Amino acid sequence: MARIAGIDLPREKRVEIGLTYIYGIGLPTSQKILEVTGVNPDTRVKDLTEEEVNSIRNYIKDLTVEGDLRREVALNIKRLVEIGSYRGIRHRKGLPLRGQKTKTNARTRKGPKKTIANKKK
């Protein structure tokens, strides 16, 4: 099993798809990595030679992925909250940041509905 950036890549998948299991690498980045390293995207992860795995590892070493990327994103959000920007306030309140309406919907960001009991008349 190929282990790259601390992640065990699934053996049966194509390398192109297997690399996307690493946080911070999507399909376009995966394709670029394989193009630069000269690895065939249709190769299965289990069929990679040690030389190919090392060339992929060396390329990914220069990218910000996994823990470093997660930390960077968390610090960016923390900075927004600390400076009190609009986006930081929305993060703090757990609301959508990018101008979506919140009268209805926005349930993913707001969480389950908090129902209010009707008053007796």
Curated annotation (Swiss-Prot):
This is Small ribosomal subunit protein uS13. It comes from Clostridium perfringens (strain 13 / Type A). Pfam families: Ribosomal_S13 (PF00416). The keyword Ribosomal protein applies. Keywords: Ribonucleoprotein, Ribosomal protein, RNA-binding, rRNA-binding, tRNA-binding. GO terms for molecular function: rRNA binding; structural constituent of ribosome; tRNA binding. One of its GO terms (biological process) is translation. Part of the 30S ribosomal subunit. Forms a loose heterodimer with protein S19. Forms two bridges to the 50S subunit in the 70S ribosome. Located at the top of the head of the 30S subunit, it contacts several helices of the 16S rRNA. In the 70S ribosome it contacts the 23S rRNA (bridge B1a) and protein L5 of the 50S subunit (bridge B1b), connecting the 2 subunits; these bridges are implicated in subunit movement. Contacts the tRNAs in the A and P-sites. SUPFAM superfamilies: S13-like H2TH domain. The keyword Glycoprotein does not apply. One of its GO terms (cellular component) is small ribosomal subunit. Residues 93-121 are annotated as: Disordered. It comes from the Bacteria. PROSITE patterns: RIBOSOMAL_S13_1 (PS00646), RIBOSOMAL_S13_2 (PS50159). InterPro entries: Rbsml_uS13_C (IPR027437), Ribosomal_uS13 (IPR001892), Ribosomal_uS13-like_H2TH (IPR010979), Ribosomal_uS13_bac-type (IPR019980), Ribosomal_uS13_CS (IPR018269). Belongs to the universal ribosomal protein uS13 family.
